[in-house]
Protein backbone atom coordinates (compact mmCIF):
# COMPACT_ATOMS: atom_id res chain seq x y z
CA UNK A 1 0.00 0.00 0.00
CA UNK A 2 1.46 3.30 -1.09
CA UNK A 3 0.91 6.19 1.30
CA UNK A 4 1.58 9.57 -0.25
CA UNK A 5 2.10 12.82 1.58
CA UNK A 6 2.49 16.09 -0.29
CA UNK A 7 3.84 19.21 1.37
CA UNK A 8 4.60 22.60 -0.17
CA UNK A 9 7.29 24.86 1.24
CA UNK A 10 8.80 28.11 0.01
CA UNK A 11 12.55 28.21 -0.12
CA UNK A 12 14.39 31.04 1.61
CA UNK A 13 16.38 33.12 -0.85
CA UNK A 14 19.20 33.48 1.62
CA UNK A 15 19.70 29.76 2.20
CA UNK A 16 22.35 27.88 0.34
CA UNK A 17 20.97 25.82 -2.52
CA UNK A 18 22.26 22.50 -3.70
CA UNK A 19 23.21 22.79 -7.37
CA UNK A 20 21.41 19.54 -8.12
CA UNK A 21 18.21 20.77 -6.54
CA UNK A 22 17.89 24.20 -8.14
CA UNK A 23 18.48 25.91 -11.47
CA UNK A 24 18.53 29.53 -12.67
CA UNK A 25 16.73 30.76 -15.79
CA UNK A 26 18.86 33.38 -17.66
CA UNK A 27 17.23 36.43 -19.27
CA UNK A 28 18.33 37.81 -22.62
CA UNK A 29 19.69 41.36 -22.75
CA UNK A 30 17.27 44.04 -23.83
CA UNK A 31 14.24 41.88 -23.43
CA UNK A 32 11.62 42.34 -20.83
CA UNK A 33 11.41 39.55 -18.34
CA UNK A 34 8.76 37.10 -19.41
CA UNK A 35 7.00 34.63 -17.17
CA UNK A 36 9.31 31.68 -16.84
CA UNK A 37 8.26 28.10 -16.16
CA UNK A 38 8.26 27.36 -12.48
CA UNK A 39 10.74 24.76 -11.32
CA UNK A 40 9.41 22.50 -8.63
CA UNK A 41 11.46 20.28 -6.40
CA UNK A 42 9.60 17.22 -5.25
CA UNK A 43 10.90 14.95 -2.54
CA UNK A 44 9.31 11.54 -2.28
CA UNK A 45 10.06 9.53 0.82
CA UNK A 46 8.99 5.94 1.36
CA UNK A 47 8.52 5.05 4.99
CA UNK A 48 7.58 1.83 6.71
CA UNK A 49 4.66 2.00 9.16
CA UNK A 50 4.70 -0.11 12.28
CA UNK A 51 2.77 -3.18 11.24
CA UNK A 52 3.36 -6.60 9.80
CA UNK A 53 3.93 -5.97 6.10
CA UNK A 54 6.49 -3.69 4.56
CA UNK A 55 4.34 -0.88 3.16
CA UNK A 56 6.30 2.12 1.90
CA UNK A 57 5.08 5.61 2.78
CA UNK A 58 5.81 8.32 0.23
CA UNK A 59 6.21 11.92 1.25
CA UNK A 60 6.19 14.57 -1.43
CA UNK A 61 7.46 18.08 -0.83
CA UNK A 62 7.06 20.71 -3.54
CA UNK A 63 9.38 23.70 -3.08
CA UNK A 64 9.00 26.58 -5.55
CA UNK A 65 12.24 28.21 -6.66
CA UNK A 66 12.58 31.90 -5.73
CA UNK A 67 11.90 34.34 -8.52
CA UNK A 68 9.41 32.13 -10.35
CA UNK A 69 6.04 33.47 -9.30
CA UNK A 70 4.26 32.91 -12.60
CA UNK A 71 1.60 30.22 -12.92
CA UNK A 72 2.61 26.77 -14.02
CA UNK A 73 3.15 26.40 -17.75
CA UNK A 74 2.74 23.28 -19.85
CA UNK A 75 6.49 22.95 -20.24
CA UNK A 76 7.22 23.06 -16.52
CA UNK A 77 10.18 21.01 -15.36
CA UNK A 78 9.76 18.75 -12.38
CA UNK A 79 12.65 17.40 -10.39
CA UNK A 80 11.64 14.36 -8.42
CA UNK A 81 13.66 12.94 -5.58
CA UNK A 82 12.63 9.53 -4.34
CA UNK A 83 13.92 8.57 -0.94
CA UNK A 84 13.17 5.39 0.98
CA UNK A 85 13.48 5.39 4.72
CA UNK A 86 11.87 3.75 7.69
CA UNK A 87 10.00 5.86 10.26
CA UNK A 88 11.09 5.53 13.86
CA UNK A 89 14.53 4.60 12.64
CA UNK A 90 17.60 5.89 14.48
CA UNK A 91 19.78 5.85 11.37
CA UNK A 92 20.69 9.13 9.75
CA UNK A 93 19.28 7.95 6.40
CA UNK A 94 22.59 7.62 4.56
CA UNK A 95 21.77 4.07 3.53
CA UNK A 96 18.46 5.04 1.94
CA UNK A 97 18.24 4.71 -1.83
CA UNK A 98 17.98 8.08 -3.58
CA UNK A 99 17.53 8.83 -7.26
CA UNK A 100 16.61 11.89 -9.31
CA UNK A 101 14.40 11.84 -12.41
CA UNK A 102 13.65 14.86 -14.60
CA UNK A 103 10.49 15.07 -16.72
CA UNK A 104 9.08 17.73 -19.02
CA UNK A 105 5.70 17.75 -17.39
CA UNK A 106 3.59 15.45 -15.29
CA UNK A 107 1.11 14.68 -18.08
CA UNK A 108 3.88 13.24 -20.24
CA UNK A 109 5.75 11.37 -17.55
CA UNK A 110 3.86 8.19 -18.44
CA UNK A 111 4.61 8.50 -22.17
CA UNK A 112 6.85 5.45 -22.15
CA UNK A 113 4.06 3.27 -20.82
CA UNK A 114 1.57 4.72 -23.31
CA UNK A 115 3.87 3.90 -26.23
CA UNK A 116 4.39 0.30 -25.23
CA UNK A 117 3.55 -2.34 -27.76
CA UNK A 118 0.18 -4.06 -27.47
CA UNK A 119 1.89 -7.37 -26.88
CA UNK A 120 3.38 -6.04 -23.63
CA UNK A 121 1.36 -5.48 -20.48
CA UNK A 122 0.38 -1.84 -20.18
CA UNK A 123 -0.30 0.19 -17.08
CA UNK A 124 -4.05 0.35 -17.21
CA UNK A 125 -4.87 1.63 -13.76
CA UNK A 126 -2.84 3.16 -10.97
CA UNK A 127 -3.45 5.32 -7.97
CA UNK A 128 -5.34 8.28 -9.40
CA UNK A 129 -4.40 10.42 -6.40
CA UNK A 130 -0.69 10.09 -7.05
CA UNK A 131 0.00 13.55 -8.56
CA UNK A 132 -0.42 15.97 -5.70
CA UNK A 133 -2.53 13.78 -3.49
CA UNK A 134 -3.20 14.30 0.17
CA UNK A 135 -2.24 11.98 2.95
CA UNK A 136 -3.39 8.47 2.03
CA UNK A 137 -2.43 6.67 5.20
CA UNK A 138 -5.94 5.30 5.69
CA UNK A 139 -6.58 4.27 2.10
CA UNK A 140 -6.88 0.54 1.33
CA UNK A 141 -4.15 -1.45 -0.36
CA UNK A 142 -3.45 -0.45 -3.94
CA UNK A 143 -3.71 -3.15 -6.61
CA UNK A 144 -1.96 -2.18 -9.81
CA UNK A 145 -3.92 -3.61 -12.73
CA UNK A 146 -2.13 -4.49 -15.94
CA UNK A 147 -3.98 -5.38 -19.13
CA UNK A 148 -2.87 -7.73 -21.87
CA UNK A 149 -5.40 -8.86 -24.43
CA UNK A 150 -8.66 -9.67 -22.69
CA UNK A 151 -7.06 -10.65 -19.36
CA UNK A 152 -6.22 -8.61 -16.28
CA UNK A 153 -3.00 -8.84 -14.34
CA UNK A 154 -3.36 -7.66 -10.75
CA UNK A 155 -0.19 -6.80 -8.88
CA UNK A 156 -0.86 -6.95 -5.16
CA UNK A 157 1.28 -4.24 -3.58
CA UNK A 158 0.86 -5.82 -0.15
CA UNK A 159 2.87 -8.84 -1.25
CA UNK A 160 5.24 -7.32 -3.79
CA UNK A 161 6.86 -3.95 -3.15
CA UNK A 162 8.25 -2.09 -6.17
CA UNK A 163 11.13 0.31 -5.70
CA UNK A 164 11.79 3.33 -7.85
CA UNK A 165 14.47 1.56 -9.91
CA UNK A 166 12.58 -1.68 -10.62
CA UNK A 167 9.13 -0.50 -11.65
CA UNK A 168 9.99 -0.93 -15.30
CA UNK A 169 12.48 -3.32 -16.82
CA UNK A 170 14.63 -2.82 -19.90
CA UNK A 171 12.14 -4.66 -22.06
CA UNK A 172 9.27 -2.38 -21.14
CA UNK A 173 7.49 -4.90 -18.91
CA UNK A 174 6.43 -3.84 -15.49
CA UNK A 175 8.62 -5.66 -13.01
CA UNK A 176 7.41 -5.84 -9.43
CA UNK A 177 9.63 -8.69 -8.36
CA UNK A 178 11.04 -6.99 -5.26
CA UNK A 179 9.84 -8.54 -2.04
CA UNK A 180 9.84 -11.82 -0.22
CA UNK A 181 6.50 -13.16 -1.40
CA UNK A 182 6.62 -15.21 -4.66
CA UNK A 183 3.04 -14.45 -5.71
CA UNK A 184 2.38 -11.09 -7.33
CA UNK A 185 0.09 -11.58 -10.35
CA UNK A 186 -3.43 -12.62 -9.39
CA UNK A 187 -6.15 -13.97 -11.69
CA UNK A 188 -9.29 -11.87 -11.35
CA UNK A 189 -11.52 -14.87 -12.10
CA UNK A 190 -10.27 -17.57 -9.76
CA UNK A 191 -7.81 -15.76 -7.49
CA UNK A 192 -4.79 -17.86 -8.42
CA UNK A 193 -1.49 -16.00 -8.12
CA UNK A 194 1.62 -16.28 -10.27
CA UNK A 195 5.18 -15.02 -10.07
CA UNK A 196 5.29 -13.74 -13.68
CA UNK A 197 2.67 -12.05 -15.83
CA UNK A 198 3.39 -14.49 -18.70
CA UNK A 199 2.34 -17.40 -16.46
CA UNK A 200 -0.88 -15.59 -15.62
CA UNK A 201 -1.51 -14.85 -19.30
CA UNK A 202 -1.25 -18.59 -20.07
CA UNK A 203 -3.46 -19.38 -17.09
CA UNK A 204 -6.25 -17.07 -18.32
CA UNK A 205 -6.85 -19.36 -21.29
CA UNK A 206 -7.22 -22.33 -18.96
CA UNK A 207 -9.40 -20.40 -16.55
CA UNK A 208 -11.81 -19.05 -19.17
CA UNK A 209 -15.26 -20.52 -18.73
CA UNK A 210 -14.36 -22.56 -15.65
CA UNK A 211 -15.42 -21.84 -12.10
CA UNK A 212 -12.07 -22.40 -10.40
CA UNK A 213 -11.84 -21.33 -6.78
CA UNK A 214 -8.29 -22.43 -5.97
CA UNK A 215 -5.95 -19.91 -4.35
CA UNK A 216 -2.30 -20.10 -3.34
CA UNK A 217 -0.33 -18.38 -0.62
CA UNK A 218 3.10 -19.64 -1.67
CA UNK A 219 4.90 -21.32 -4.54
CA UNK A 220 4.71 -24.82 -3.03
CA UNK A 221 0.92 -24.79 -2.90
CA UNK A 222 0.83 -23.58 -6.49
CA UNK A 223 3.12 -26.44 -7.54
CA UNK A 224 0.92 -29.00 -5.74
CA UNK A 225 -2.17 -27.56 -7.42
CA UNK A 226 -0.49 -27.80 -10.83
CA UNK A 227 0.63 -31.39 -10.11
CA UNK A 228 -2.90 -32.49 -9.24
CA UNK A 229 -4.12 -31.10 -12.56
CA UNK A 230 -1.43 -32.85 -14.58
CA UNK A 231 0.66 -29.70 -14.89
CA UNK A 232 -1.88 -27.99 -17.18
CA UNK A 233 -5.32 -26.71 -16.31
CA UNK A 234 -8.19 -27.71 -18.64
CA UNK A 235 -8.55 -25.32 -21.57
CA UNK A 236 -11.86 -24.17 -22.92
CA UNK A 237 -12.85 -25.35 -26.41
CA UNK A 238 -15.59 -22.97 -27.49
CA UNK A 239 -15.44 -23.72 -31.23
CA UNK A 240 -17.52 -26.80 -32.05
CA UNK A 241 -17.83 -28.56 -35.39
CA UNK A 242 -21.46 -28.69 -36.52
CA UNK A 243 -20.88 -31.91 -38.47
CA UNK A 244 -19.12 -34.26 -36.05
CA UNK A 245 -19.27 -32.28 -32.78
CA UNK A 246 -15.52 -32.08 -32.25
CA UNK A 247 -14.40 -29.00 -30.28
CA UNK A 248 -11.35 -26.80 -30.70
CA UNK A 249 -9.67 -24.04 -28.73
CA UNK A 250 -8.95 -21.86 -31.76
CA UNK A 251 -11.24 -20.78 -34.57
CA UNK A 252 -8.48 -21.37 -37.11
CA UNK A 253 -8.23 -25.01 -36.02
CA UNK A 254 -11.97 -25.42 -36.58
CA UNK A 255 -11.68 -23.96 -40.07
CA UNK A 256 -8.90 -26.39 -40.94
CA UNK A 257 -10.99 -29.26 -39.54
CA UNK A 258 -13.98 -28.27 -41.70
CA UNK A 259 -11.92 -29.04 -44.80
CA UNK A 260 -12.07 -32.72 -43.87
CA UNK A 261 -15.85 -32.68 -44.28
CA UNK A 262 -16.00 -30.33 -47.26
CA UNK A 263 -13.05 -31.86 -49.09
CA UNK A 264 -11.58 -28.41 -49.74
CA UNK A 265 -7.90 -28.50 -50.72
CA UNK A 266 -6.79 -24.99 -51.63
CA UNK A 267 -3.04 -25.72 -51.79
CA UNK A 268 -2.03 -27.25 -55.13
CA UNK A 269 1.35 -28.57 -56.21
CA UNK A 270 2.66 -26.83 -59.32
CA UNK A 271 4.62 -29.91 -60.40
CA UNK A 272 2.00 -32.68 -60.36
CA UNK A 273 -1.24 -30.83 -59.57
CA UNK A 274 -1.93 -32.70 -56.34
CA UNK A 275 -3.95 -30.67 -53.83
CA UNK A 276 -3.70 -30.46 -50.06
CA UNK A 277 -5.82 -29.04 -47.26
CA UNK A 278 -2.88 -27.46 -45.41
CA UNK A 279 0.16 -25.57 -46.61
CA UNK A 280 2.51 -27.63 -44.43
CA UNK A 281 1.37 -30.79 -46.22
CA UNK A 282 2.18 -29.16 -49.55
CA UNK A 283 5.65 -28.22 -48.34
CA UNK A 284 6.36 -31.82 -47.33
CA UNK A 285 5.01 -33.07 -50.65
CA UNK A 286 7.23 -30.69 -52.64
CA UNK A 287 10.27 -32.51 -51.24
CA UNK A 288 9.32 -35.57 -53.28
CA UNK A 289 9.97 -33.50 -56.42
CA UNK A 290 13.08 -31.70 -55.22
CA UNK A 291 14.59 -34.82 -53.64
CA UNK A 292 15.28 -33.04 -50.37
CA UNK A 293 15.39 -35.78 -47.71
CA UNK A 294 17.21 -34.40 -44.65
CA UNK A 295 16.23 -37.18 -42.21
CA UNK A 296 18.49 -40.26 -42.36
CA UNK A 297 17.99 -43.63 -40.68
CA UNK A 298 21.03 -44.58 -38.61
CA UNK A 299 20.34 -48.30 -39.08
CA UNK A 300 20.03 -48.69 -42.85
CA UNK A 301 20.83 -45.22 -44.21
CA UNK A 302 17.41 -44.67 -45.78
CA UNK A 303 16.44 -41.02 -46.10
CA UNK A 304 13.07 -39.36 -45.47
CA UNK A 305 11.58 -35.97 -46.19
CA UNK A 306 9.89 -35.61 -42.77
CA UNK A 307 10.75 -36.48 -39.20
CA UNK A 308 7.46 -38.34 -38.76
CA UNK A 309 8.32 -40.58 -41.71
CA UNK A 310 11.66 -41.41 -40.11
CA UNK A 311 9.99 -42.26 -36.80
CA UNK A 312 7.56 -44.61 -38.52
CA UNK A 313 10.44 -46.26 -40.36
CA UNK A 314 12.46 -46.75 -37.17
CA UNK A 315 9.68 -48.95 -35.83
CA UNK A 316 10.49 -51.50 -38.51
CA UNK A 317 13.93 -51.91 -36.90
CA UNK A 318 12.83 -51.79 -33.28
CA UNK A 319 9.63 -53.80 -33.76
CA UNK A 320 7.64 -51.36 -31.66
CA UNK A 321 3.89 -51.45 -32.32
CA UNK A 322 2.27 -48.91 -29.98
CA UNK A 323 -1.18 -48.82 -31.60
CA UNK A 324 -3.61 -51.55 -30.55
CA UNK A 325 -7.04 -52.40 -31.92
CA UNK A 326 -9.75 -52.36 -29.24
CA UNK A 327 -11.79 -54.98 -31.06
CA UNK A 328 -9.30 -57.79 -31.56
CA UNK A 329 -6.19 -56.61 -29.69
CA UNK A 330 -3.96 -56.62 -32.76
CA UNK A 331 -1.03 -54.18 -32.66
CA UNK A 332 0.20 -51.89 -35.42
CA UNK A 333 3.28 -49.72 -35.86
CA UNK A 334 1.45 -46.93 -37.68
CA UNK A 335 -1.73 -45.08 -36.74
CA UNK A 336 -3.03 -44.96 -40.31
CA UNK A 337 -2.68 -48.74 -40.54
CA UNK A 338 -4.74 -49.08 -37.37
CA UNK A 339 -7.48 -46.88 -38.85
CA UNK A 340 -7.62 -49.01 -41.97
CA UNK A 341 -7.83 -52.13 -39.81
CA UNK A 342 -10.62 -50.69 -37.67
CA UNK A 343 -12.70 -50.03 -40.76
CA UNK A 344 -12.60 -53.76 -41.45
CA UNK A 345 -14.42 -54.36 -38.14
CA UNK A 346 -16.97 -51.69 -38.86
CA UNK A 347 -17.53 -52.89 -42.39
CA UNK A 348 -17.78 -49.30 -43.59
CA UNK A 349 -16.73 -48.60 -47.16
CA UNK A 350 -17.81 -45.02 -47.79
CA UNK A 351 -15.74 -44.51 -50.95
CA UNK A 352 -17.53 -46.08 -53.94
CA UNK A 353 -16.15 -46.39 -57.46
CA UNK A 354 -18.49 -44.77 -59.99
CA UNK A 355 -17.38 -47.20 -62.73
CA UNK A 356 -17.89 -50.60 -61.11
CA UNK A 357 -19.52 -49.78 -57.75
CA UNK A 358 -16.75 -51.32 -55.67
CA UNK A 359 -16.39 -49.82 -52.19
CA UNK A 360 -13.24 -48.91 -50.31
CA UNK A 361 -12.46 -47.90 -46.76
CA UNK A 362 -9.93 -45.22 -47.76
CA UNK A 363 -10.04 -42.50 -50.38
CA UNK A 364 -6.48 -43.28 -51.50
CA UNK A 365 -7.50 -46.86 -52.19
CA UNK A 366 -10.29 -45.59 -54.41
CA UNK A 367 -7.85 -43.39 -56.35
CA UNK A 368 -5.52 -46.34 -56.94
CA UNK A 369 -8.44 -48.48 -58.08
CA UNK A 370 -9.69 -45.85 -60.52
CA UNK A 371 -6.37 -46.00 -62.38
CA UNK A 372 -7.29 -49.52 -63.46
CA UNK A 373 -10.24 -48.00 -65.32
CA UNK A 374 -8.47 -44.95 -66.70
CA UNK A 375 -5.16 -46.71 -67.46
CA UNK A 376 -3.22 -43.89 -65.86
CA UNK A 377 0.38 -44.73 -64.90
CA UNK A 378 1.93 -41.60 -63.40
CA UNK A 379 4.99 -43.28 -61.83
CA UNK A 380 7.78 -43.60 -64.42
CA UNK A 381 11.19 -45.23 -64.01
CA UNK A 382 14.03 -42.80 -64.74
CA UNK A 383 16.33 -45.63 -65.90
CA UNK A 384 14.24 -47.46 -68.49
CA UNK A 385 11.11 -45.32 -68.80
CA UNK A 386 8.71 -48.02 -67.68
CA UNK A 387 5.58 -46.65 -65.99
CA UNK A 388 3.41 -47.95 -63.18
CA UNK A 389 0.07 -47.09 -61.67
CA UNK A 390 1.32 -47.31 -58.08
CA UNK A 391 4.47 -45.95 -56.48
CA UNK A 392 5.11 -49.20 -54.61
CA UNK A 393 5.41 -51.07 -57.91
CA UNK A 394 7.91 -48.50 -59.17
CA UNK A 395 10.04 -48.91 -56.04
CA UNK A 396 10.12 -52.67 -56.53
CA UNK A 397 11.11 -52.21 -60.17
CA UNK A 398 13.94 -49.78 -59.37
CA UNK A 399 15.62 -52.44 -57.21
CA UNK A 400 16.37 -54.30 -60.43
CA UNK A 401 18.54 -51.39 -61.58
CA UNK A 402 20.16 -50.71 -58.22
CA UNK A 403 20.81 -54.36 -57.42
CA UNK A 404 19.53 -53.98 -53.87
CA UNK A 405 18.07 -57.20 -52.46
CA UNK A 406 17.04 -56.54 -48.85
CA UNK A 407 14.93 -59.70 -48.38
CA UNK A 408 16.93 -62.86 -47.59
CA UNK A 409 15.80 -66.43 -47.00
CA UNK A 410 16.47 -67.80 -43.54
CA UNK A 411 16.85 -71.37 -44.89
CA UNK A 412 19.40 -70.94 -47.67
CA UNK A 413 20.39 -67.27 -47.49
CA UNK A 414 19.21 -66.39 -50.99
CA UNK A 415 18.28 -62.70 -51.39
CA UNK A 416 15.43 -61.08 -53.25
CA UNK A 417 14.60 -57.54 -54.32
CA UNK A 418 10.92 -57.74 -53.34
CA UNK A 419 9.12 -59.41 -50.48
CA UNK A 420 6.79 -61.31 -52.78
CA UNK A 421 9.81 -63.02 -54.36
CA UNK A 422 10.96 -64.17 -50.94
CA UNK A 423 7.52 -65.56 -50.14
CA UNK A 424 7.39 -67.53 -53.38
CA UNK A 425 10.83 -68.89 -52.66
CA UNK A 426 9.92 -69.95 -49.13
CA UNK A 427 7.09 -72.08 -50.51
CA UNK A 428 9.72 -74.23 -52.20
CA UNK A 429 11.28 -75.01 -48.84
CA UNK A 430 7.87 -75.72 -47.36
CA UNK A 431 7.05 -78.25 -50.08
CA UNK A 432 10.41 -79.93 -49.67
CA UNK A 433 10.01 -80.17 -45.93
CA UNK A 434 6.49 -81.56 -46.33
CA UNK A 435 7.68 -84.22 -48.78
CA UNK A 436 10.53 -85.20 -46.49
CA UNK A 437 8.15 -85.51 -43.54
CA UNK A 438 5.86 -87.79 -45.55
CA UNK A 439 8.77 -90.03 -46.56
CA UNK A 440 9.85 -90.36 -42.94
CA UNK A 441 6.32 -91.28 -41.91
CA UNK A 442 6.03 -93.96 -44.63
CA UNK A 443 9.42 -95.41 -43.74
CA UNK A 444 8.47 -95.69 -40.07
CA UNK A 445 5.42 -97.71 -40.97
Swiss-Prot record:
Zinc fingers (C2H2-type), renumbered ranges: 185-210, 239-261, 267-289, 295-317, 323-345, 351-373, 379-401, 407-429
InterPro entries linked: Znf_C2H2_sf (IPR036236), Znf_C2H2_type (IPR013087)
SMART domains per record: ZnF_C2H2
Top-level division of the source organism's lineage: Eukaryota
Biological processes per GO annotation: regulation of transcription by RNA polymerase II
Gene Ontology cellular-component terms listed: nucleus
Residues with Phosphoserine modification: 89
UniProt KW keywords: Metal-binding, Phosphoprotein, Repeat, RNA-binding, Zinc, Zinc-finger
UniProt GO MF annotations: DNA-binding transcription activator activity, RNA polymerase II-specific; RNA binding; RNA polymerase II cis-regulatory region sequence-specific DNA binding; zinc ion binding
Name of the protein this chain belongs to: Gastrula zinc finger protein 5-1
Amino acid sequence: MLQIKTEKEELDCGDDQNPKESSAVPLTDGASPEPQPQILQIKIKEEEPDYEYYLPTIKREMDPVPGAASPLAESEILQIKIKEEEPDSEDDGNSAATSAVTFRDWDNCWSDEENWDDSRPQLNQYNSDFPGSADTANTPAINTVLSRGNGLFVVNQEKRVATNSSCQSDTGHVDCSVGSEPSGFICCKCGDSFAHHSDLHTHLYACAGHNITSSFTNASEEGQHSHKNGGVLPREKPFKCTVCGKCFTLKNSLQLHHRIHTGEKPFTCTECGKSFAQSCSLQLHSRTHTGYNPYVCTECGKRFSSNSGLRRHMRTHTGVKPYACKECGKFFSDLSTLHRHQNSHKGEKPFICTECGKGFTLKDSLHRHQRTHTGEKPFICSQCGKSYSQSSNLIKHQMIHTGVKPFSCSECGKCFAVKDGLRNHQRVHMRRNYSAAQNVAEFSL
